[in-house]
Every structure is written in structure tokens, then in C-alpha cells.
Curated annotation (Swiss-Prot):
Fe cation binds at C92, H134, H138. Its cofactor is Fe(2+). One of its GO terms (molecular function) is peptide deformylase activity. It comes from Bordetella pertussis (strain Tohama I / ATCC BAA-589 / NCTC 13251). The lineage of its organism: Bacteria, Pseudomonadati, Pseudomonadota, Betaproteobacteria, Burkholderiales. This is Peptide deformylase 2. Binds 1 Fe(2+) ion. Removes the formyl group from the N-terminal Met of newly synthesized proteins. Requires at least a dipeptide for an efficient rate of reaction. N-terminal L-methionine is a prerequisite for activity but the enzyme has broad specificity at other positions. The active site is at E135.
């Protein structure tokens, strides 16, 4: 089990756009295992490779309460979004301790590759739809707090810098 270091907002590397995975090989499968271990250890319900400073289009998600329904999305692409919207309070492993409401599509359809490189499609609603959209945003260089007002973004940056200074003193 290898735990990866998670980048913290506002690290500029979180704004890099991830490149598509050309070949799903053992290196990618190891990345998936390490990302899953990191996500479960954090604990979180989703993690994009961008968050661990790997700029390839790889996402792991598990929104189950038991933590036993790992979904691997390689080169994920949302192919349809409902016009209906939903608002969820989101958090992020790259923005620790910060939660705020974000409005997103209520239902989506997504296509991706699994860890064997096989294509698949699925539809999602509720927390899974939110999580897929959130993690794909990471791959596109966007962090959830960027949906918030400038005032809220500045408050979050101040709060995170203060927490970082306190952690350094400890």
C-alpha cells in the first residue's frame, strides 16, 4: 500500500489540465491502487490523479457507505447532463475542512475505461453524479471552490494559510 501526497489548494499544479491515458498498463493500474489506498485512508469518496500531482485522466470514486464499491474511471467523459440541477454541500481532499454548496447537473451519463482498458458507460444521479462531475473538474484544472464567490474563495485561502501556519508551529 502506497499513500500518495495530496496537493492542497491553492497549489497551482491543481490547475493543470490532465492528459488522456494512452495505454492502460501496469503503471496505470498501480496508480489506481495507490490512489484508491490514498482516498480510503484520507478518508474521501473520490480522488483525481491531478490531486496527487499526476496529470493523467484517472479518477477513483467510492460513494458507498461501506467503502466497498470502487469505481475506476480512466479518460472519463460526460456525454450527457440533465437540465435538472441539484445542490450538494461539497468538500475536497485538496481543500481540507472546507465545505460549501455547489450546483451541478442532477443526472449525468459518463463513458470511461476500466483498469483493464475496457470501455464502459454508466448513468449516475445523487452523490455519484456530483462526485463524477467534481473529479472530472479536477482533471480539467478546476477546484470546487472556484464555483463560489470571490469573497468566499478569499476567505477559504486565508483560512487554509492560517491552518498551514499553525501546523508548521506544532
Amino acid at each position: 500500500m502506497a499513500l500518495l501526497s495530496i496537493l492542497r489548494y491553492p497549489d497551482p499544479r491543481l490547475h493543470k489540465t490532465a492528459k488522456p491515458v494512452a495505454v492502460v498498463d501496469d503503471r496505470i493500474r498501480q496508480l489506481v491502487r495507490d490512489m484508491a489506498d490514498t482516498m480510503y485512508d484520507a478518508p474521501g469518496v473520490g480522488l483525481a490523479a491531478t490531486q496527487v500531482d499526476v496529470h493523467e485522466r484517472v479518477v477513483v470514486i467510492d460513494v458507498s457507505e461501506e467503502g466497498n464499491d470502487l469505481r475506476v474511471l480512466i479518460n472519463p467523459e460526460i456525454t450527457w447532463k440533465s437540465d435538472e440541477r441539484q445542490t450538494y454541500e461539497e468538500g475536497c481532499l485538496s481543500v481540507p475542512g472546507i465545505y460549501d454548496e455547489v450546483e451541478r447537473a442532477a443526472r449525468i451519463r459518463c463513458k470511461a475505461l476500466d483498469q483493464q482498458g475496457q470501455p464502459y458507460e454508466f448513468e449516475a444521479d445523487g452523490l455519484l453524479a456530483v462526485c463524477v462531475q467534481h473529479e472530472i473538474d479536477h482533471l480539467d484544472g478546476k477546484v470546487f471552490v472556484e464555483y463560489l464567490s470571490n469573497l468566499k474563495q478569499n476567505r477559504i485561502k486565508t483560512k487554509l494559510k492560517k491552518a498551514e501556519r499553525e501546523a508548521e508551529r506544532a
